[in-house]
Regions:
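Active-site-adjacent beta->alpha loops and helix N-cap segments on the catalytic face
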Residues: 4, 54-70, 84-90, 104-126, ...
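Active-site-adjacent loop and "lid" segments of alpha/beta metabolic enzymes
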Residues: 19, 133-145, 174-177, 185, ...
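Non-catalytic positions within long, well-ordered alpha-helices that form the structural scaffold/packing
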Residues: 40-43, 93-94, 157, 211
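C-terminal helical cap(s) of enzyme catalytic domains, especially alpha/beta-barrels
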Residues: 112-120, 211-212, 217-220, 224-242, ...
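Structural preference for beta-strand elements that scaffold enzyme active sites
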Residues: 3-7, 46, 74-78, 98-101, ...
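Catalytic cores of alpha/beta
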Residues: 73, 77-99, 181-217
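Short catalytic helix/loop segments, enriched in acidic residues and glycine
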Residues: 22-40
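Conserved anion-binding
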Residues: 12-13, 17-23, 98-172
Length: 253
């Protein structure tokens, strides 16, 4: 059963989507709180919120939008974008985020990331692994580091990281399908990793295919906004799996 995580990306207080992280491709879809309420009404339990202004400016910007969502919904929210300092992190948690994604900081200030992991626990810190051409990208995907994805994951998985949000940048917003091989390779190497696949989802079938290869969770955004995802079908599939697993566990041999 794959965890379904709709995404809300925010620029200037509005819900938007980009293509391959290019801010010039911005498409506005409305008010973040309205979208969050819509996802909750559909039966979603989790929400991925990205402060794109924050990612670009290197500090959290859209904290009010986050607070509005956590105040007016019961969604479990993970938040990312511009979280670079202890104050940024504390503001995100104070605004109601249950989990915070930290990616760039794990490249630029590894000791700070590790201190957050120790202080808040692996259940509340998500390692953001945004990858382009095999290298980890930082600062809203505007810069490529010289760190290979496999080295990045190896270091922080050994340090106790459990949650990893991996985005294949070349796929993001294209609706052309996720990086199946990349995610499968990560899961084979780190079977205990709670991997959140992100980027390229273009249909309900893409999500079902990720589920079939054992990916624990998926973030989707543009595909939903463009009417390509049937959330009711996905929830029905998950509920059927829960029911089937329950029957299997209850069977006496």
């Amino acid at each position: 059963m794959i965890e379904l995580i709709p995404a809300i990306d925010i620029i200037e207080g509005k819900c938007v989507r980009l293509t391959k992280g290019d801010y010039d491709t911005k498409k506005v879809y409305g008010n973040p709180l309205d979208m969050a309420l819509q996802f909750e009404d559909m039966g979603m339990k989790r929400l991925h919120v990205v402060d794109l202004d924050g990612a670009k400016s290197k500090h959290v910007v859209n904290i009010d939008a986050l607070k509005a969502i956590t105040t007016h919904t019961k969604l479990t929210v993970d938040f990312g974008g511009g979280v670079k300092t202890d104050d940024d992190l504390e503001r995100a948690f104070d605004a109601g985020a249950t989990l915070v994604t930290a990616g760039s900081i794990a490249i630029t200030d590894p000791e700070r990331y590790l201190s957050w992991l120790e202080k808040y626990g692996a259940q509340h810190i998500i390692l953001g692994a945004d990858v382009r051409n095999g290298l980890v990208s930082i600062n809203g995907w505007k810069e490529d580091s010289d760190v290979k994805l496999e080295d990045f994951l190896e270091r922080y998985m050994k340090a106790g990281t459990k949650n990893v949000l991996c985005t294949e940048i070349s796929k993001d917003g294209t609706l052309e399908g996720p990086a199946f091989k990349l995610y499968q390779t990560i899961m084979e190497r780190y079977p205990d990793c709670h991997l959140i696949a992100s980027g390229g989802v273009g249909s309900t079938e893409d999500i079902l295919a990720l589920d079939n290869i054992g990916i624990p969770a998926v973030v989707f955004g543009k595909a939903f906004y463009e009417g390509r995802i049937n959330i009711a079908k996905l929830l029905e599939t998950n509920n059927h799996k829960i029911s089937t697993e329950g029957e299997t566990k209850g069977t006496v041999c």
